[in-house]
Design a protein with these regions (language model features):
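Extended substrate-binding grooves/exosites of carbohydrate-active enzymes
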Residues: 1-124
């Protein structure tokens, strides 16, 4: 079986499934098993509605507070793994997504670091 020269994984541990730490575990286990293969993080993010805040944020609560926790964890994880060849936050801006009705907003993916109108930088 031939594999590509590089691989990237689109993981959402800590948002759609599992816990944040599973991102760390996945990449560490992959790198330990295949130390000579390039691996990247092709997509990661967590939805946030800036109107939602929490003193004790939790996965799936759509709070700006949890989005900040999520990205702080991911950035620390990336910083500790210089062997990751690429990382891609999803997404710079919130964007239209007609089929979505989550986090208090219909028709919008709220994984952006900035609101859909480009006016509010989220605390991520």
């Amino acid at each position: 079986l031939e594999i590509p020269d590089i691989n990237s994984y689109n993981l959402y541990f800590g948002w759609y499934l599992g816990e944040l730490e599973q991102n760390d575990e996945f990449f560490d286990e992959y790198h330990e098993k295949y130390p000579d293969r390039a691996i990247g993080f092709s997509e990661y993010g967590a939805d946030a509605n800036p109107q939602y805040q929490a003193a004790a944020p939790e996965k799936g609560d759509y709070t700006e507070s949890y989005q900040a926790v999520y990205h702080e964890h991911i950035l620390q994880m990336i910083e500790k793994r210089p062997w990751l060849w690429a990382t891609h936050v999803w997404n710079l801006f919130d964007f239209a997504a007609d089929g979505r009705d989550e986090g208090g907003k219909h028709g919008e993916n709220q994984k952006g670091l900035v609101t859909i109108d480009r006016k509010t930088k989220k605390d991520a």
